[in-house]
Amino acid sequence: MSSYNLPDDKGHFEQYGGIFTAETLMIAVTELKDAYAKFKDDEDFIREFEQDLKHYVGRETPLYHAQNLSKKLDGAQIYLKREDLNHTGAHKINNTIGQALLAKRMGKTRIIAETGAGQHGVATATVAARLGLECVVYMGEVDVARQALNVFRMKLLGATVIPVTLGSKTLKDSINEAMRDWVTNIDDTFYIIGTVVGPHPYPMMVRDFQSIIGKETKVQFAAQVGGLPDVLVACVGGGSNAIGLFHAFIDDASVEIYGVEAAGYGLEKGPTAHSAPLCAGSVGVLHGNRTYLMEDENGQIIEGHSISAGLDYPGVGPEHAYLKDSGRARYVAITDKEALEAFHVLTKVEGILPALESSHAVAYGIKLAKELGKDKHIIINLSGRGDKDIHTIAQIEGIEF
């Protein structure tokens, strides 16, 4: 039985999390909180969720021993949790399946979502198509340009994609616009947030749906190797793939946990050069919860940078903020250059194209493997596949199609 039982009933991970939202949104948030409390332990809901994960998403995903990479590094043994093999190509669908099933039970007919890299938008459009729900996706204009393939995928699936032209025109602004929509259309609309941010119950609910990653990993590692892994590594933007892997291991003190943020051009080059609030940010409130943020001395959000569209969110899930402060997890940062190098290494050595987000975790896993002995075992969460990033990488490397 796990001794870790956060958040509390108000959504707090000690000083982080909570519900910081406008009065106009409290009705919708309260309705969602009550519905999730009602259905999360309901046998029929759990059965349908698990069946969909198995037969529609394709779970369980493999835990793959990257023997070629391990041999090349001559260090620790590296295992990859292959979330890239899910339907739609990333971990995002674990969460959208759960929230869409909840929306149906709440009688909602319209789904809205925000997206950065486009993977959450695609995963939301996918489940909306399957369940016959109207779907609107808000996506920053900058992200629309750098993720054109995913925009087309969403439209093919029947979603309406609305480019957001306010602010930095990226993920933060997409969330703002989605929340405005939700306030205006509370009666028929369900907002599927794509990561472990937002007002309670979102950080808990998204974690719960993503925790299948760690639960599977624990069983798979015990079967393949025995015992527990030495180290877990996952990339952190909002942090849903990471908390999905970490959650099952939080009570296992022998397992070291590393979350990898985006150092962009380098942490030393200042706050606009990276997206690493846990490594170089401060505590504040954004999108309904208290957490670490990229903000200036006046409390204004700083627009950071990452090569990866899924890692340039200026905040992070409140549970990660708690895990950092408590010392249970360590948070580090990897530069664009290091992530790109790791992308090429994994592609050439194992024949697996990781997403640029996941490449940050791969890069740090490679660093650790070189430092640790051959008897150590590292699990890296390969949160998504890299098909969506081919154009970005080609552009950076001066390749034209």
Swiss-Prot record:
One Pfam assignment: PALP
Subunit structure, interactors included: Tetramer of two alpha and two beta chains.
Cofactor(s) listed in the protein's UniProt record: pyridoxal 5'-phosphate
GO annotation, cellular component aspect: cytoplasm
InterPro entries, per database record: Trp_synth_b_CS, Trp_synth_beta, Trp_synth_beta/beta-like, TrpB-like_PALP, TrpB-like_PALP_sf
The EC number(s) this enzyme carries: 4.2.1.20
Superkingdom of the source species: Bacteria
Pathway per the UniProt entry: Amino-acid biosynthesis; L-tryptophan biosynthesis; L-tryptophan from chorismate: step 5/5
Protein's name according to its UniProt entry: Tryptophan synthase beta chain
Catalytic reaction list: (1S,2R)-1-C-(indol-3-yl)glycerol 3-phosphate + L-serine = D-glyceraldehyde 3-phosphate + L-tryptophan + H2O
PANTHER family in the cross-refs: TRYPTOPHAN SYNTHASE, TRYPTOPHAN SYNTHASE-RELATED
Positions of post-translational N6-(pyridoxal phosphate)lysine modification: K92
Role this protein plays: The beta subunit is responsible for the synthesis of L-tryptophan from indole and L-serine.
Source organism per UniProt: Ruthia magnifica subsp. Calyptogena magnifica
Molecular function as annotated in GO: tryptophan synthase activity
